[in-house]
Structure formats: structure tokens, C-alpha cells
Amino acid sequence: MDYKINRALKDLLISDIPYAAVLEVKNKEGQTFNLKINYTNIKEITPSLAKEKFVDSQMLDEDIGYLKINTWSSRVNINGQNISDLVEDNLKLLASSKSLIIDVRKNSGGDSKLAEKLAGHFITQPIVYGTVLTRELGHDTLVNQNLCLQPQGDYLDKKLVILTGPDCLSSNEMFIMMLKDTNRAITVGQTTGGGSGSPKSFNIHLGERKFTLNIATWKMRRNNGSPLENIGIEPDLPVITTPDDVIQYQDPDLKKAIEYVHSHLEI
């Protein structure tokens, strides 16, 4: 149900209808509240996006760092810096942290190579984090290929918690697999969207209407044998967002992660 609510809210927020919407929310006590959602034309705000819209960080206390990454897109270029460069700059600001909470809940993917550059900081040797089943070009032969993460840059010996949700897709799910399925991090929040497939796009025309057809080129499986498609990656610590959390602008996922760090990880 949380997944459906999140999807409905997302659809409202990106709607092309230039009007405000009023959402009625009922809490456990039966009280109802009206939430007004204002339409914003994304074309009006895109040119002014700052670095913080893509990557942001802060120290939550003297030991816990918080790193938010909203995309792995290779098209991001801020004064010559790509996403990986922005992440590296923010990691330097969190150098004193003993534990790191990585928030990728709003990240729908991009370039897995950029994701590998961050994940590679937290391993000391190559490690397999999943497999993909592909078809050889021009043949019916199916081939299993291991997905292997290589160490990248300086090793960062930090305890890791990753915040996940239904908007996590594609190469961002691969990033989560790199650290969760290799027992390098625990995840908190909601199950991811379950969408990879490494699709290829084809433009087709039906009469005067134009469509884009996306065709999957592989099937991805996690180290535990579970398929990723349409299933997603379940969190180690699931969290339910209540109507009261929405009304009061609370972040129960982050709260749970901080509680876990304080009570379970050596700081």
C-alpha cells in the first residue's frame, strides 16, 4: 500500500495539469487532513539546478555522515564535474565520519560505472555482486555473466547504511546490490522498484502516433538467486511511512537508520 501511495503522489507531482491538487489524508485516529499539492513546471526550474539537487551531504553528529545521491546520470555536468566528481567532493566533507548513511531513495539510475566508483571505495578486493543472463548477438545461445565490483581509489573503512525505496531502479539497484548483496551494507526503508533489463529503445509509428518501445537485453539475478525484475530488493530493516509522518514532514527511514547505527554499529 505504501508503494501505491508513493506512486500516486509522484504522479501528482509530475502531472502536466497546471493546477493544484488537494489530497485528503486520514490518520489512525480517524482524523482527516487536507494536503495541497502545487503544480510546478519542471522546465522552469531545471536551468537553476545546483549541485545540491544531485548530491548533498552533512554530518548528522560527530560520528555519522549523511550522503544523498539523486541520480547516477552521465549527462550531469556542473562546471565540468560529473556525478562521480560531486560524490568525491562530498566524501571529503565526511572524512571524519565512522558510519555513513547513503540516501538513494530518489535515484532512478543512470550509469552503473559512476555508481561503481563510489561502491569501490568500500571493498579491498574484487567481488561478484550479481549475474546477468544475455543472448549472444545473432545466436540463440544464452550466456551467464558475473557482475564484478573492483576496488576504486582509497579504501574507506566505514559502517554503511543505505536508504532505499520504490523509486530506486536500474543502475541504482545495481549500486545497492554492490554493497548489500556483498554484506558490506545494510538497507533501511522500502523495497526497490525492481526494474533493470538494460533496455534498448526503438521508435515506432502507428498512424500519426509515435511510440518508444523499450526492449530488455538481459535478465539480472542477485547473489541469492532471486531475480531483480518486478521484485526489487527488499530492505533489511523495513519502514512504513504513516500519514502522520507525511503531515509532520518526518523521515522515518532516516530516523530508523540513525537508531540502528547508534544501537548496533560500533562507533
Residue positions per predicted region:
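Conserved PDZ fold ligand-binding element
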Residues: 1, 101-103, 179, 187-189, ...
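Flexible, low-complexity junctional segments that flank or bridge functional domains
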Residues: 1-99, 106-108, 120, 124, ...
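Soluble non-cytosolic domains of exported or imported proteins
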Residues: 3, 77-85, 109-116, 154, ...
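Extracytoplasmic
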Residues: 18-20, 32, 61-64, 95-99, ...
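Structural recognition of the beta-strand scaffold that forms the well-ordered cores
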Residues: 65-68, 100-103, 159-164, 186-189, ...
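Extracytoplasmic/secreted envelope proteins and their assembly/folding machinery
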Residues: 84-91, 115-119, 157-160, 172-176, ...
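Short, well-structured beta-strand/strand-turn elements
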Residues: 100, 169, 182-196
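Gly/Ser/Thr-rich loop/hinge elements
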Residues: 109-163, 167, 197-207, 217-221, ...
